[in-house]
């Protein structure tokens, strides 16, 4: 079983959190996810670290649950929407002498992903959807 770190799961445990206000809790949950990620890199014996990359509602979590649930590794369930953030995470993984692996999850139909995004319990602005999809693709090109 992998050790999964997800800002979305952390968000649910924050005081006064409600899905309608998800965007307001995102910065804090992402900060806590980064902190948990750093701790896992230091303390967890797994040698592989998977970074998920893809925009909001792209299917990353579903991919994780169906395809990665038997892996023995650390998994960061995030959008990887900035090159700076990706670079920092990759440097930390390498410094911990672990192997970084990036799985990019890109929806076959952006319109369908947007409809899924609009119908989620967790509410974010439309700009967040476009920012994470464009940013994750830019990051993927930067990494490769």
Where are these regions (language model features)?
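Glycine-rich phosphate-binding loop of ATP-dependent small-molecule kinases
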Residues: 1-144
